[in-house]
Amino acid sequence: MNVLIIGSGGREHALAWKVAQDPRVQKVFVAPGNAGTAIEAKCENVAIDVLALEQLADFAENNVSLTIVGPEVPLVAGVVDLFRSRGLDCFGPTAGAAQLEGSKAFTKDFLARHKIPTADYQNFTEIEPALAYLREKGAPIVIKADGLAAGKGVIVAMTLTEAEDAVQDMLAGNAFGEAGSRVVIEEFLDGEEASFIVMVDGKNVLPMATSQDHKRVGDGDSGPNTGGMGAYSPAPVVTADVHQRVMDLVIWPTVRGMADEGNVYTGFLYAGLMIDKAGNPKVIEFNCRFGDPETQPVMLRLQSSLVLLIEAALAQALDKVEAQWDPRPSLGIVLAAGGYPGDYAKGAIIEGLDAAALLEGKIFHAGTTLQDDRVVTSGGRVLCATALGDSVGSAQKNAYALAAKVDWQGCFYRTDIGYRAIARERGEDQE
């Protein structure tokens, strides 16, 4: 069989790499893909944009029996609806169900309706009421652009001035365009974050391995938010007890609530959670797809066939399958272009990929492209160096050894990915 994967990031390279390992799969097409998917065994790039929905459907109709959607933008635009209307198998939520990521206001209202734990909040489209609410609540407080903003439309304001500036920027200054014409202001939550990703077939749920992302650009979680600078799996904060609570309090009510409201959910569902000291989860956000960079360490640990699991999901038979995981932790470090998440240069030649390929682990490509057979940078997050280890500490050591082999002008990465889990392993107190 042939499979199409829509997207061009590190997540899509990891999905393509995993799908290609299934002996039944002859060819994995990636649209539009990157340099990594261009050179990956059994993989081939197709020059179709993620929003060229009709072209994607035409290609799928003629070439593949299954399509997997990586990024959120085509999901919110209705790629799954189009594929279904043409009788094509496509794994992901419909546009209606993808509102869980496409609109933060929709999500907060949905959570409130179904009594799913989340931060207290209000939605605003006008500046004055928003500022009045800020002054009433005080800082720290969180301001979110309502629509899709590539993971960057969230400001955690530690002072009232910072909060007021963020609201002004979004509602008046048009900082995030259409995405920021409505804002959600919510209480600041204390605790530890975890990424809880499951597969959903409309009624059954299959949890994936847990993970923890590192959103801030700098060491010690400093600097602005990014799409994610690294991740590891599993997340020790999600104990067996917390796992059960998340399923009972968050995942099941979400899947049933969406179905009750006429938006039956099929696809990957990613709950971004804050876990407090007592182990109580609250929903920070939903994503209607696998996380990036979480996909990379999670796929490294998945031993089952991803294709088999997705086929089960499309047949509403997720209750009949189990996912097998490598018991060892994995960790991925994002190598980014200097200046990210702000402006950055493109077109730098990446050195050392062949040397890195000789080490244990895997380098997944994100913002890369091929130019005259050389791999060059083409995005802010460029590569993700990912490795397994007997502990998070050893996975970290292996991943950094991999990252150290690679370089280009302006390359940078955080040096502390996994620090919370490693402190836990050493028995140090978590602050």
Curated annotation (Swiss-Prot):
EC number(s) recorded for this UniProt protein? 6.3.4.13
Annotated residues for binding of Mg(2+): 285, 287
Per UniProt, the keywords (alphabetical) are: ATP-binding, Ligase, Magnesium, Manganese, Metal-binding, Nucleotide-binding, Purine biosynthesis
Q: Provide the catalytic activity annotation.
A: 5-phospho-beta-D-ribosylamine + glycine + ATP = N(1)-(5-phospho-beta-D-ribosyl)glycinamide + ADP + phosphate + H(+)
Q: Which InterPro entries match?
A: ATP-grasp, ATP_grasp_subdomain_1, PreATP-grasp_dom_sf, PRibGlycinamid_synth_ATP-grasp, PRibGlycinamide_synth, PRibGlycinamide_synth_C-dom, PRibGlycinamide_synth_C_sf, PRibGlycinamide_synth_CS
- Statement: the UniProt record of this protein carries the keyword Cell cycle: no
One Gene Ontology MF term: phosphoribosylamine-glycine ligase activity
Residues that, per the record, bind ATP:
134-195
Entry note: cofactor: Binds 1 Mg(2+) or Mn(2+) ion per subunit.
What top-level class of enzyme does the UniProt entry assign? ligase
Q: Which cofactor does it need?
A: Mg(2+); Mn(2+)
In its UniProt record, which GO terms are filed under biological process? Answer: 'de novo' IMP biosynthetic process; purine nucleobase biosynthetic process
| Pathway where it operates | Purine metabolism; IMP biosynthesis via de novo pathway; N(1)-(5-phospho-D-ribosyl)glycinamide from 5-phospho-alpha-D-ribose 1-diphosphate: step 2/2
Q: Where is the ATP-grasp domain?
A: 108-315
Q: Which HAMAP family match?
A: GARS
Instruction: Tell me its family.
Output: Belongs to the GARS family.
Q: Which NCBIfam families match?
A: purD
Q: Which PANTHER family match?
A: PHOSPHORIBOSYLAMINE--GLYCINE LIGASE, PHOSPHORIBOSYLAMINE--GLYCINE LIGASE, CHLOROPLASTIC
Q: What is this protein called?
A: Phosphoribosylamine--glycine ligase
Q: Which organism is it from?
A: Pseudomonas syringae pv. tomato (strain ATCC BAA-871 / DC3000)
Upper classification of the source organism reads: Bacteria, Pseudomonadati, Pseudomonadota, Gammaproteobacteria, Pseudomonadales
Please name the gene that encodes this protein.
purD
